[in-house]
Amino acid sequence: MKRTVSIISIFLLCFSLSAQDSLSIKSQIDALQKQYDVNFVYDPGIIQGIDSKEITLSGKNIKKDLSAVFSGTGIDWELRKNFVVLSKEYEQELSSNIDTLEAARITTDKLRRTNRTQTGLNHLDASKLLSGYAVMSTPDIVKVLQTMPGVASGSELMSGLYVHGGTGSDNLYLLDGVPLYQVSHLAGLFSSFNSDIVESVDFYKSGFPARYGGRLSSVVDVNTKAGDFNEYHGSFSIGLIDGRFNIGGPIVKGKTSFNLSLRRSWLDVVTVPTFAIINAVNRKYGEKTWFGYSLWDVNGSITHKFSEDNVLRLNLYNGQDRMKLSNKSLPTDDDPSTDISSVKVNWGNSLASLDWNWRFDDKMSMRSMLYYTRYNGKMAYGYEDRSNDTKVFSGDKEESGNISRVQDIGLKTDFWWMPAEKHLVRFGASVQPHFYRAERYAEYSRYVDGNEIPDSTASNGAKYYGTEFSSYIEDEMKLTGWMSLNAGLRYSAYQTGRKVYHSLEPRAALTFSVHPSVDIRASYSEMSQFNHQVSSVYMDLPTNLWMPSTESVRPMRSRQVAAGVYARLPENMSLSVEGYWKTMSGLIEYVGKSTLFPPIDSWESQFTSGKGRTWGVEIQYQWVTAVDNLDFSYTLSWSQRNFEKIWNGWYADRFDNRHKINVSYTRKFTKRFDAYIAWCWHSGNRMTVADYMVDTRHVFTMGDKPVKVEMEGFAVSEIPFYTRPNNVKIPDYHRMDLGCNWHRVTKRGNESIWNLSIYNVYCRMNPFYAVVGRNGMYSSEIKARAYGLVPIIPSFSYTLKF
């Protein structure tokens, strides 16, 4: 099969171009480069075999000189600022161009990461996501981001993202510009982003542009693919615990297209025979257990082009988790009753948006969006006691649970204005009404002769409303040939009840090009967050609540300075060293009794406000070719907290991982086979353990009588004493992952891929939780023992593209 292929290598630096090209035309390119201070971008093969021409360069008009050099050669040129991009069309077997095209794409992506103004920005495209980290053979965006320097992952296999000492709930997740509140499936095993439909991800850790706001620590901006306007494309994947399907194409050719992507797990199907066997074995013990779990994601979009400059797009998304666990004690001759206990957990996101993009002219364009987004979480417990076909539980059936819901309606408009070639101004505004609901309930009903009679319902809940308004202006310009600036200002206001909070957030990022291949960048940014995730545990569970800032709980705020050196090295290598310092205020921490459900009534009184600080250095090295991809990163960081009601002074954060190393290597051995290996290690998380127990009868007295000490309503004779919070570091975390892909072409010309992945190759049982107890029956010393839960996990998947 022959096709016309245009080979363009974008942003390839002149100092790394091959010296084995045709000397005649190469010398003319060098002369133009020196004369006009431009960089030529091209594939070395396109100038081979071209005869030299005797010409005289004018030195006054670059366009005339370019036309003189390349006229009659078949080479097309395009002037892009201070780059000249060369391309050439020719017919050749497509298979022989795969590596060249891949090299051009990889080089472009590598230089995109280093040729920008912002610090702390990582750009990922679809190919990077699909070729990287895959647990259960399912590529996952958040799992890839967890491997980035400056990011802590929290508990193993969870979707935690603790960026630069953040809290985990201070990351702004955007799906096509719409915020998501919950991005975890299966308790964090997967994220809510289906990689089949993802086009690109921009991940900001510092140097935030003024157009982003509402969270403290990071921005994860996920953009999905629009459907093809001329042809139908799709894919089908089946894995160990889930399946995926994607299809897109024209509705009206050249005018309207669609893209639909589905993902669903079949754990609920797989567990049916498993628990059938378990129940057959346990029947003699009079017990029956049932477990069902399912998750799904549905992404859809319809795009209509009124013209090339006027595009309207409708985006829809729904992602849900459903879990039920029940245990049933069967009747016996001695006890004819049947006890049933159950747990139900549901959570998920839904969103809809209408996105209008209008390009007025070459200098002005606009994007306006109306959207709705909702998060809903529910956990419920139930218990029944059946006797002689009549259900009785002290005359009642009981179900109690917890509900958390957040709904946003938003309208935002952004403008792009380019007053000059190297000058871009962005500005816009948005308004977001927020609706929060938190509820704890208990329902009782009586069964008489098999009929359910509602008895009573008890509930306590809270509803909050808040309106967030923001506006910004952002100016990006190239001040000189060696200095670029991105400066902006964001204003936000939040009304909750009779209280209005105002926030002015300056942003600035500056780049100095000290060498054609070396940049020095620095940035300063301030961020505000008006909503809080209320949790009484250190895990992202459906029981957690979202609450707004109130008159007594102020918004959170962060200030961050970052600076670094970024080098583009020969042989497709890059190296960056970046440091940061960040402070946070308005953080909240739970100080109430230990419980799974966070408080709802007067929740502000059971949380205390404090501050945080974090600093560190990140080193990242990359080597990327058409067949090899090596990525190494190291992070040295400190993360501390200061809550006066918890401790008088600074102490280490729970996820204060001092050192972190990530190494990954991908190799394309042939066109049909590639493999990857990854290894990660970081210092262990921290936990609070009492240093010793003190007998209070010999310590506290009032006059001649000992004081009676009570903890949670029980009189005790001893209490724990701590040196400081998070005083113990659990063992370090490390593991290795392997994976490989087999590619083949089916008889119909479609690509199929077999993937085999192994998570935790050497079965390191990394600490997941710890048990605290005495170091001996009569000892006052305390010891803690960590336990691991996640062993080696092999998995596979099959993908067919059409």
Locate the predicted segments by residue.
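Outer membrane beta-barrel strand-and-loop segments of large Gram-negative receptors
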Residues: 408-412, 459-464, 550, 554, ...
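Short, acidic, small-residue-rich periplasmic hinge/interaction motif at the N-terminus
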Residues: 29, 33-36, 73, 83-131, ...
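Gram-negative outer-membrane beta-barrel transporters
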Residues: 581-583, 605-691
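Periplasmic N-terminal accessory/gating domains of Gram-negative outer-membrane beta-barrel systems
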Residues: 116-169, 177-195, 200-208, 225
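Transmembrane beta-barrel wall of Gram-negative outer-membrane proteins
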Residues: 241-265, 281-325, 344-365, 372, ...
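C-terminal beta-signal and adjacent terminal beta-strands/loops
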Residues: 269-270, 672, 681-716, 731-735, ...
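Flexible loop and strand-edge segments within Gram-negative outer membrane beta-barrel domains
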Residues: 291, 311-359, 374-405, 542
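Surface-exposed extracellular loop regions of Gram-negative outer-membrane beta-barrel proteins
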Residues: 322, 376, 442, 516-561, ...
